[in-house]
Amino acid sequence: MPNMSLTKVPMPEQDPNVRNKNFEEVALGYTKEMAMEEATRCINCKNKPCMSGCPVCVRIPEFIAKVAAGEFEEAYKIITSTNGLPAVCGRVCPQENQCEGKCIRGIKGEPVSIGRLERFVADYHMAHSNDDTIKPESNGIKVAVVGAGPAGLTCAGDLAKLGYEVTIFEAFHKAGGVLVYGIPEFRLPKAIVQKEVENLEALGVKVETDMVIGRVLSIDEIMEMGFKAVFIGSGAGLPSFMGIEGEALVGVYSANEYLTRANLMKAYLDDYDTPIIKSKNVAVVGGGNVAMDAARTALRLGAENVYIVYRRGMEELPARGEEVHHAIEEGIIFKTLNNPVKLIGDEDGRVCKMECVEMELGEPDSSGRRRPMVIEGSNFQLDVDTVIMSLGTSPNPLIRTTTKGLEANKWGCLVVNEDTLETTRDNVYAGGDAVTGAATVILAMGAGKQAAASIHERLSK
């Protein structure tokens, strides 16, 4: 009989007053007993709506049934038949809007905790299994992947399993893309990402780091090296700013730069070459997951006061509810219905104040959210010594501007065939944030799978 409890088995977590001073993972993971208990909440319904919410088509009820039976390795095999990054997805996917958002159990009570179960299965496999990956027999066909983020890693893995000789060209010195430079250690430990990359390498995938495509090599030069197809999964790393006075002051960062310095380049250690200046009062402008990551990172780096400055209300925050909840628990101060209009510097050129205006919400705009409007005469100043702009990102134009015939839309996103993900260049495919603009890890992975299938169909003819 299914477990008809209306609530999920709680996830063990670090105490907020302890974790806000360290970079260790916040969520500690289920035990075997917890996972099996939660798995019994799945009623294995006939239509399986949860699967329609998964961009990589994980056979969710099947793997959960194996967890309930204690057959964790069988569950892992089911998950990894379609998802090459289960330990990542179990931690950072917005399940509440995807698989769990469609779970029948959520109609009355809480949905089954699909993400936590996926994480448990992946972590159990890492802890208890020997690496028994079998490298597929090569078909002799070379395929290049640009970018070692979620889209590129997924595309590479799917093609490698089919026997293709895949080389990933990664601009940074570590593979993982946003998984290593954008998402903090306390949400996604880098050892997890490294293990997933090693799993790909065991399949025969080669990873070339420090390869900025468009500078070191062009797409045309890659094709001349004998690669029969190229997948561009270069992400969206070009940050947006407000265009207000003072954004060039010392102490003003994009969230992208701030998190990259902290996550990838260990800027919190004094002996590294890319330090983040010490901060007392930090303001993060924006309300998405990246803003929460930046704010929570600033707190861990020693800031006394960290503010989220957002022009709409708490109900309109685009960040995951779990991330907002964790930020509040840790002491982040939310200044909603506020918007910066000017940054003010001291005599040394470092930001020292942020001038804001209060906002009120009017009628809904084209996105369906109520439009924020300035309350005249409501200006006030906030003492700050660091400002982090978390206003979204767009694709870097480097590849587009160095590749003839590669078309992009007005936002700089590559134009692709929706069915095949082929660009306007023959045998050049693209997916993930390079096509959609900044989106989720799992959507990028779905694009990587789609492109791999298209490349295989083309090259196997």
Regions found by a protein language model. Name each.
Residues S52, V56-K135, E201, T209, ...:
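Glycine/serine-rich phosphate-binding loop and adjoining beta1-alpha1 elements at the start
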Residues A248-S279, P364-A438:
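FAD-site-proximal beta/loop scaffold in flavoenzymes
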Residues G84, G149-A151, K174, G288-V290, ...:
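Residue-level detector of alpha-helix initiation sites
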Residues I168, F172-L203, V207, A295-K342:
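Rossmann-like dinucleotide-binding cores of NAD(P)H-dependent redox enzymes
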Residues V121-E137, K195-R215, F241-L301, N409-D419, ...:
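Glycine-rich dinucleotide-binding loop and its adjacent helix/turn
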Residues E74, E137, K142-V146, Q194-I244, ...:
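Feature captures the FAD/FMN-dependent oxidoreductase FAD-binding
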